[in-house]
Structures are given as structure tokens and as C-alpha cells.
């Protein structure tokens, strides 16, 4: 969840992150509010996805509707000290082949090799971070895979990060003029242009396009969305409101996209194309995704980190 702030895939689109200059009670209140939002959003998303499981056509999706299973976990930091933890929410259903909606709140000290890479950690390695992370892979190749995460990070500085992106798995649907692409981009733009006025949609859309790119394939992972990090406008309440708007936009648009596609029948060729496209997803997450790499190198929960990988995949 806490990624490095450097690297080829992370152009410096974030605003300058300010040094914290406030009393402890204010910082703690902000931590509490951010964590509460992430966990409430998790609950709303899980409930929405379970309704989709109930409503999916029985003829295409036989069997019982899936339900989320929650598994708590704890972590230790590099010194062995207690470092918080989280809750994995996983579902393998008749519509959602695999979906994880995870919340975590972690704290501790960054290992020496990471301190220079994190804003505010070079001289004081202590950190706190809370967030929500989601990836969904559906059985129906007509329904795109999706990823969303938002987080709040505190060192001697504090900032928000996150985003959402859509990955159609059929080439004929992987276009910017596809109805799903248009609707998803419109929803993310709406989240960025709310009255709080602290987000830059054009930058965050471009950042997403550049981040979710496989250079060895010379292709994008999906059709894009938004991606942002080190977001600190100087108005914390507005920054939280923006992050909430991203979550609400996702909660509205993705179930709509699922519903408009889940009654479409698919062929064996569609499934084959889906499995091959999932291979690209695996390649990106294991080779380039800084959250995955960082989590594996800093003692994160392996099951949670790798839950983003699809349950079945092929390479031709």
C-alpha cells in the first residue's frame, strides 16, 4: 500500500508535500477519519458486489451466489516490532471469479534502504498508513477487470494517493470509444472536478496512462483511469473529500458497468482471449507495480499483496 516515491513509472506529478506543523490531536483525528472512511467504503463495495452475485443470470452463472470471507492479519516491521495489520475480504463467486477488497492500517519504521525514497522519512523513519485496495476479475470476458485503491500516509509529512483503472480483456472492447471506457473516464473526471477543486484530472489521467504501461510489451495494461500520489493541496479536508469522491465514483460506476455486461454470453474464444490478457496483468503486477514490489520487500502480508493476481491465466 505504501509505495516508493521514485522510479521510472512515477513521474513527479504530485504537488510538494508539506512538513507537518500541527498538534498531535489533529494528526490523530485525521488518521481516525481517513481510516473510518476506507473501512466504510470497503463495507459498501462488498455489499454492492454481493448484490451483483445475487442478481447475475442463473443461466450463465449456475450455482450459489458468492459471499466475502474476511481474514484479519498482523505485521511486524523490519525490527520485529508490532506494525499494525489489516483485513482481507475475498470472494470467489459465480460472477466474480476472484475479487479482493482489502483494508489495512500499518505503522512502524521504514528500513534504512527505503527511507530516502519516502517523503519525510529520510531523517525520521517513523510512518503510519491506512488505505483500501481492490482488484476484481470476473468470469464473463465482456466484463472488464478493475483496480482501485486510495490511501493516507503520514511521516513527518502527510499525503493522499490512489486511483482507479479499468482493464477490458477483449481486444474489441479495449478502445477509448467503447461505452464502458467512456463511462469510466467520465466518472473519474467527475470525481476530480468536484467543488473542492484540489484535483487535476488531466495530470492524473496522464499519470495513470504512463504508470499502467508494460514497456516490454509496448502496450497499456488497460484503458486507463486516474492515478495520483503525494496529494497535499494544503487543505486536508478538501483532500479527504477528493479521495472520498474517487471512492464514491468507483462505487457507482463499476457496478453499473458489470450490470450492463453480465447478461452477455461468451464463447470459448472469448475465454481464451481473457486468459491471455490476464497474463499481461500478471506481468505488470510482478514486474512493475511498485506497491507489489514494495510490499514484498517490507514484510507485508503476502496473501493480500498477491491476491491481485487472477485465478486462472494463460500464456500462448
Curated annotation (Swiss-Prot):
Positions contributing to a divalent metal cation binding: 137, 147, 185, 216
Residues at the site labelled Important for dimerization: 216
Residues annotated to bind substrate: 133, 149-151, 299-301
A molecular-function term among this protein's GO annotations: coproporphyrinogen oxidase activity
Function, in words: Involved in the heme biosynthesis. Catalyzes the aerobic oxidative decarboxylation of propionate groups of rings A and B of coproporphyrinogen-III to yield the vinyl groups in protoporphyrinogen-IX.
Assembly with partners or alone: Homodimer.
Family: Belongs to the aerobic coproporphyrinogen-III oxidase family.
Entry protein name: Oxygen-dependent coproporphyrinogen-III oxidase
Organism taxonomic ancestry: Bacteria, Pseudomonadati, Pseudomonadota, Alphaproteobacteria, Hyphomicrobiales
Amino acid at each position: 500500500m505504501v509505495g516508493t516515491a521514485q522510479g521510472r513509472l512515477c513521474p513527479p506529478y504530485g504537488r510538494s508535500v508539506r512538513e507537518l506543523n500541527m498538534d498531535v490531536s489533529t494528526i490523530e483525528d485525521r488518521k481516525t477519519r481517513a481510516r473510518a472512511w476506507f473501512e466504510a467504503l470497503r463495507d459498501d463495495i462488498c455489499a454492492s458486489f454481493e448484490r451483483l452475485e445475487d442478481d447475475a443470470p442463473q443461466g450463465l452463472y449456475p450455482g450459489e451466489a458468492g459471499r466475502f470471507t474476511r481474514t484479519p492479519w498482523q505485521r511486524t516491521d523490519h525490527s520485529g516490532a508490532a506494525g499494525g495489520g489489516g483485513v482481507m475480504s475475498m470472494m470467489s463467486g459465480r460472477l466474480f471469479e476472484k475479487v479482493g477488497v482489502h483494508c489495512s492500517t500499518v505503522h512502524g519504521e521504514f528500513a534504512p534502504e527505503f527511507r530516502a525514497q519516502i517523503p519525510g522519512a529520510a531523517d525520521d523513519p517513523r510512518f503510519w498508513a491506512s488505505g483500501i485496495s481492490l482488484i476484481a476479475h470476473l468470469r464473463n470476458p465482456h466484463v472488464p477487470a478493475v483496480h482501485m485503491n486510495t490511501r493516507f500516509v503520514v511521516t513527518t509529512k502527510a499525503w493522499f494517493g490512489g486511483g482507479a483503472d479499468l482493464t477490458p480483456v477483449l481486444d474489441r472492447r479495449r478502445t477509448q470509444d467503447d461505452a464502458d471506457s467512456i463511462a469510466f473516464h467520465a466518472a473519474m473526471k467527475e470525481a476530480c472536478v468536484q467543488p473542492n477543486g484540489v484535483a487535476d484530472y488531466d495530470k492524473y489521467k496522464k499519470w495513470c496512462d504512463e504508470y499502467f504501461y508494460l514497456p516490454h510489451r509496448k502496450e497499456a495494461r488497460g484503458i486507463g483511469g486516474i492515478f495520483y500520489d503525494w496529494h497535499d493541496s494544503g487543505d486536508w479536508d478538501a483532500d479527504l473529500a477528493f479521495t472520498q469522491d474517487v471512492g464514491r465514483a468507483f462505487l457507482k460506476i463499476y457496478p453499473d458497468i458489470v450490470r450492463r455486461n453480465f447478461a452477455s454470453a461468451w464463447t470459448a474464444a472469448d475465454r481464451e482471449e481473457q486468459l491471455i490478457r490476464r497474463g499481461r496483468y500478471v506481468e505488470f503486477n510482478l514486474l512493475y507495480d511498485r506497491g507489489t514490489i514494495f510490499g514484498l520487500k517490507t514484510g507485508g502480508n503476502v496473501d493480500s499483496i498477491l491476491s491481485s493476481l487472477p485465478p486462472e491465466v494463460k500464456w500462448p
